[in-house]
Amino acid sequence: MPGLNLTRDEAIERASIIKRVHSYHIFLDLRTDQDVFTANVEIRFDAQEGASTFIDAITSSVKSINLNGEELSTDLADGERIQLPNLAAENVLKIEAEMFYTNTGEGLHRFVDPADGEIYLYSQFEVPDSRRVFPVFEQPDLKATFEFEVRVPSHWVVVSNQPEVKIEEKECGCGRANTWYFKPTPRMSSYITAIVAGPYEKITSELTNSEGRVIPLGVYARKSLMPFVDAEDMFELTRQGFEFYEEQFKTPYPFEKYDQLFVPEFNAGAMENAGCVTYLETYVFRSKVAEALRERRAITVLHELAHMWFGDLVTMKWWNDLWLNESFAEFMSTLAAAENTRYAKEAWATFSASEKTWAYRQDQLSSTHPIVAEIRDLADVQVNFDGITYAKGASVLRQMVAWVGQENFMAALKVYFDKHSWGNTVLDDLLVELERTSGRDVRAWSAKWLETAGVNTLAVEVENDEAGNISSLGIRQSYAEGFETLRPHRAVIGFYNLVDGKLTRTDRIELDIDGELTVVEEALGKKRPDLLLLNDEDLAYAKIRLDERSIETAIKHLGDIDSSVARGVVWGSLWDTVRDAQMPARKYVDLVLNNIGKETNSTALRTQINNLSATLHSFVAPEAREETRHRAADRLWELACVAEPDSDAQLQLLQAFINQTRTEEQYDNVQRLFEGELTLEGLDIDADLRWNLVCRLATGGRFSAEQIAEELENDNTANGQQYAAQAYASIPTAEAKAEYWNKIMVTGELSNMIQRYAIAGFKSGKPELIAQYNEPYFEQIEGIWRSRSHEISMQIIGGMYPSEPTAELLERTEAYLASLPEDAAALYRQIAEARDGVARALKVQAADI
């Protein structure tokens, strides 16, 4: 894997030689066998005469290389790059090659549908994987037009960035085939080009944009999955997104069509290929899902649409400005949801519960980095698709918009798009427009917010007189060791009082916070409320420390706060105090169990269940862990039983109970649910919930391999195969664990998605069953990192890291990190993040008294 790297210095040097890439004409023959396919490419580009460079191409074999009419030796190709000597001022390069299909979700992924045996293909190119499909100058600033010609079996469809211009049917050596010809694209980076091919089915619609242009819309999925696709919901969200973005940006949608395709075994949530967006199939709901997942799908739809402007129309020059793509798309998607969709009421509460929780966690790891990160090479950027680039960046943008004003912000974006359409930008290109429209010193703001790392803590310091009126109120700002930056914050202080059983806001103060101590003069003389909520409305990006009186009010009445955003701020503040070892873990467990039954925001409920699980596994003192887990599972069962029938809460609480099942009595309830002897009103044991029960019963030794095989026979679908892998790997026997250790760590035979589920199964159950694999993990992981693809190795590095946070594991991990060579920086980062988790867990365990 490291041999496939490209450094920033190499990219800069190549861009100085390649003056302009004009066009690619790419022919792909996708009728070939399951291992390789044919790719022929013609590239026209200008270069420094007499210079030499290289083109990226991860190939099975190279048949021919022709540069300006001269046949070059195929020895110039090493399977990763093709050297190009003695360039002319104007060049025509023709290459014929065979490329590999993958089962890792990188390059051109090949999937066989178990339901009907049909073959489906899709491309995934970000960051550096268009080179797995055709020879290409794989860096974002070498833009060009791309014209695709694709030959496929006659019953397939092909979708790309542009509309097809014709389809030719021919009788070929291996049967009838169709060749699809597509219009050339506008100038774009290679990583947002796309090819999706197979017997996909589609549903079509259209919209008329702000220019009066009719934009064709399409939603695609596998034949066996299409009955579950909610195309109307996708179209509704797409129309709402188009309307909002074109109005805000004053810039029309830049492409000719907008297709959205659900593709199998996709690694990410989605990918913003220009006019041809791909999504993971988890967003097709064949069973009932939490409303949190429906809202996540909506945010993802809006996120990818925002990328058509941020990233596709205007692209970062190099990957250090990846945030110009991702932070903006993340922020704009929530803003669009809040202002122009049915998710308006809950959008920012969801953002608080999901994105900001992710950001705060990532920003407190040793691997944290500025939003504008230092990216030395591709290995750096591949591990920087993280909570800083996405979630912190979006959080900070929200802070910026509150500071400069939304109208000024959007006006700056219009000029930015006008100036840089189809080009590449750096940070300063945006800052100059923001300063012009707002009159603010945005560069100084950027230096503190975008170019430094770490999260500040804002703590309330309040006193009142004998009458209960506030006599002093200050906000004290601090920073973590090693991150000595105090930042400006725009924030709201909410005054909440109990009114008719609800904690209701009765007053608010909006202010700028800066420096070590900000005195809030406006609060003096006001009645001290039951809850003084700093960062109400969640504008600021900071850890929040409430005063003791407010903490006690929150613990007793968290579920009674009538604002979902305010509840989210309180949930987040209390979670931070646990993670920082300032609240005993068992007290937090009680807090969650006493309040989640009243939580109405689906994503907040999901987040608190996840935090509860992490606390039970890692933060509760070891001597109290089993008893606390038993008690928590019992309480989750009680909450599920009394939840409103057929409600989101009922489903989430039941799934939480299933995942926390420990005792024989608890397993009995799971067994009876599976067998239909026990029912909850309004609850249907549908396909996915049935598999949840199967996986847990397998973990408890109550479901055999033979029974799993029977379940798979009844649900031999992509979903069924994934769940079956998890169930098999969950069986609590040495033989089952050894079998899946071998499949994951040794043979590498599993596809990306099957491996993901298998890892979850392998790690389930009693930790002593897999403790024997702790040392082999450290012995094998560097070899896996060096030999497997990025996506596969990242799954294994994080997923197979030893489970139990102990002092021995911390010591072993530190020793391993010290032994790693300098060229293993990306591996070091992933292991160091796992180490950070162990160190934090031990600190929190020690405080759980």
Language-model segments: residues:
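Extended, low-hydrophobicity, Ser/Thr/Pro/Gly-biased non-transmembrane segments
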Residues: G3, A15, E98-E206, E374, ...
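Beta-strand-rich binding/interaction modules
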Residues: S61-L67, V442-R443, A453-L534
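N-terminal, polar/Ser/Thr-rich
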Residues: M1-T38, P114-Y120, P140, R443-A447
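Long, ordered, helix-rich scaffold segments
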Residues: G387, A467-I470, F483-T485, L498-R505, ...
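Extracellular ectodomain segments of secreted/surface proteins
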Residues: S23-G50, V460-E466, I475
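A surface-exposed beta-strand-loop module
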Residues: A57-P114, P135-E138, C172-T179, E516-K527
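Hydrophobic alpha-helical and helix-loop surface patches within well-folded domains
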Residues: F182, E211-V214, G218-G482, A614-T615, ...
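Surface-exposed beta-strand/loop patches in extracellular or lumenal glycoproteins
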Residues: E42-T59, E138, E147-P153, G474-G494
